[in-house]
Amino acid sequence: VALINNQFLSYPYYAKPGAVRSPAQILQWQVLPNTVPAKSCQVQPTTLARHPHPRLSFMAIPPKKNQDKTDIPTINTIATVESTITPTTEAIVDTVATLEASSEVIESAPETNTDQVTSTVV
């Protein structure tokens, strides 16, 4: 295993040699329909079989991530909301002007009634 440091990579790669066929060798074994295979692809006696030696090539493998880190447990941060009934007291003011059936001008102040109403808000 060889370490590859490249100015264009943000982190080093470790190269591992592997046997990979060249594209020319791969194309050599593909047979198209309605064609006669080349002599190199036909069955030959075992004494005359040609097996090219595969070239070694290098594959870039990224380094393993640090597995020593402690996993942070997930915590449910969404609290359950329960509805509560909150009684509220509101003051309602009714202003009523009293009109009498007469021709006299009424100069009295209008009557004001204040009632307390209790409602429940959910």
Swiss-Prot record:
GO annotations of cellular component type: extracellular space
Domain of life: Eukaryota
GO biological process, one term: lactation
Residues glycosylated per entry: T74, T84, T86, T89, T95, S102, T118
Tissues in which the protein is found: Mammary gland specific. Secreted in milk.
Lipoprotein found in the keyword field: no
Keywords in alphabetical order: Glycoprotein, Milk protein, Phosphoprotein, Secreted
Phosphoserine modified-residue sites: S102, S119
Location in or out of the cell: Secreted
Residues annotated as site: Cleavage: F58, M59
Family stated for the protein in its record: Belongs to the kappa-casein family.
Functional note: Kappa-casein stabilizes micelle formation, preventing casein precipitation in milk.
Designated name of the protein: Kappa-casein
Higher taxonomy: Eukaryota, Metazoa, Chordata, Craniata, Vertebrata
Gene coding for it: CSN3
